[in-house]
């Protein structure tokens, strides 16, 4: 396995990622984001993550759900596709409990993670999908709050409290990037 390296992502790096659509672009050339977000406990996460992703200029949002969450998402953003299909990036875990069997909807959401693990496109992991961090082949960005990061690190035999992470987030971000 190749040694993992980390570097600082700058505003200049971000600017190079922004592509202004031209008259020859279409939804597929502008990117298709697969979303596995929201749950019965946190349905708003599905709606907010989908509408926020569409506001970026993304070509298509593909919401993966086997529950009533799709109706909420479609009510807010009818342009969302709610059928499985190819994606160019993933966002997973927001609004999903980290315990797979906490409720039936969460169990179903975790089953969708199997699809994510079979692909190699860039992936953003949050909340309930953080257990996949460091286990995927694809480029991965994690977005935990301090409590989620403490739980993730503890699952990797690193003892740290959320208060310690909040007191020195830069150090813990660096340590996490080296660990994962």
Q: Which residues are covered by each model-predicted region?
A:
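Small-residue (G/A/S/T)-rich helix-start motifs and N-terminal tracts that mark the onset
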Residues: 1-127, 131-141, 146, 150-180
């Amino acid at each position: 396995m190749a040694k993992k390296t980390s570097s600082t992502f700058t505003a200049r790096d971000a600017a190079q990622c922004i592509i202004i659509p031209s008259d020859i672009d279409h939804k597929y050339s502008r990117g298709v984001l697969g979303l596995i977000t929201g749950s019965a406990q946190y349905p708003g996460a599905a709606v907010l993550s989908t509408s926020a992703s569409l506001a970026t200029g993304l070509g298509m949002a593909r919401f993966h759900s086997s529950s009533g969450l799709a109706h909420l998402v479609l009510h807010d953003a009818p342009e969302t596709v709610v059928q499985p299909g190819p994606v160019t990036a993933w966002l997973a875990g927001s609004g999903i409990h980290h315990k797979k069997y906490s409720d039936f909807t969460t169990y179903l959401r975790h089953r969708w993670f199997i699809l994510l693990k079979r692909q190699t496109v860039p992936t953003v992991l949050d909340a309930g999908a953080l257990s996949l961090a460091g286990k995927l082949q694809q480029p991965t960005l994690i977005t935990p709050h301090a409590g989620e990061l403490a739980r993730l690190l503890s699952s990797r035999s690193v003892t740290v409290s959320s208060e310690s992470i909040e007191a020195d987030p830069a150090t813990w971000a660096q340590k996490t990037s080296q660990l994962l």
